[in-house]
Amino acid sequence: MWMAAVAGALVLIVGLFAYHRYSLQQTEKKYPPDGEFVTVEGVKLHYISKGEGKTVVFLHGGILTGNDFRDAIDLAAEQGYRAIAFDRPGYGYSERPKNKRVTPRDQVRLIHGALRQLGVQKPVLVGHSWSGTMTLAYALDYPDEVSGVVLLAGAMYKEGYPAERGDLISQLVTNPVIGDLFLHTVIRSPLGAALTKLTLTHTFAPEPIPEGYREATLAFWLRPGQFKANREDVLAFVPAAKEASKRYREIRIPLIIMVGENDPFGTKEQAHRLKREVPHAKLKVIPGVGHMIPQNHPELVMRALGALSE
């Protein structure tokens, strides 16, 4: 009896693994890379670049890719900017450094190296959600190489961050044995689809999920490498924010803090705190808007960019 049960379990695991491989191949066919690549420290990074003029660099949050900013990229290019959006390391078609836990400052260093290779000088940095702390860390590490920062619903402090008191899913996924089995058999199953639906509904609330976004999330976020990168980032955020926030008062460059009045993640409170610590920053709280500003309100991204020069 037990041998039959073991055999059945093995067949199920092999079947799920094969389905995952097939599903990943279909994702790459449906959503091929639409940008270019640059290699930094042996890590290949994918980016989109459009337009000519002053450079704006967009850094996405924790679910999808640089394409989160696709509408803002189009608007920026139309309005005379050179718009660059990276897939952060491990997301989209960007590689992630192997055999180490990647910190936000590791990602800062890689993005900085990529921009130097691309000949970018003194860009404006735009960071959304999780990238709030990373964007500020970049400005603190390279203060003479950034002309301004825009934070969109940014997470900047460990206090109030969802994983501040621990995150069981992230702990499971980043376990070297159980995590790999989960990622290569379960994550693209109906369980993963249910998790995606729950996550997106909460993340976009109280606003609608844009057409096609759910499908793209199922395709990209539920890839083993990207989901693991996301959960590593969740765990890395708390110590990174704790360290970076000690230096926020040192920020001297122009800074715009934009947050939705109805953001469900507590970023409004973080925005007010950052404004107190960086008095010259401009704080803009937008009525009726939630967390996903780049996806639902690209025109607000442009308004924030314009406010840098006001």
Per-segment meaning from a language model:
Residues 26, 161-163, 185-250:
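Conserved alpha/beta-hydrolase catalytic His-Asp/Glu region
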Residues 40-42, 48-50, 85-126, 303:
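Active-site loop/oxyanion-hole signature of alpha/beta-hydrolase fold enzymes
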Residues 49-93:
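Conserved HGGG/HGGXW glycine-rich cap/lid loop of the alpha/beta-hydrolase fold
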Residues 121-164:
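Conserved hydrolase catalytic core segment
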Residues 150-185:
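Flexible "cap/lid" loop of the alpha/beta hydrolase fold
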Residues 236, 261-266, 291:
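Acidic catalytic loop of the alpha/beta-hydrolase fold
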Residues 251, 257-259:
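Short beta-strand/loop motif that positions the catalytic acidic residue
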Residues 280-310:
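Catalytic active-site module of serine/aspartate enzymes centered on a nucleophile-bearing elbow/loop
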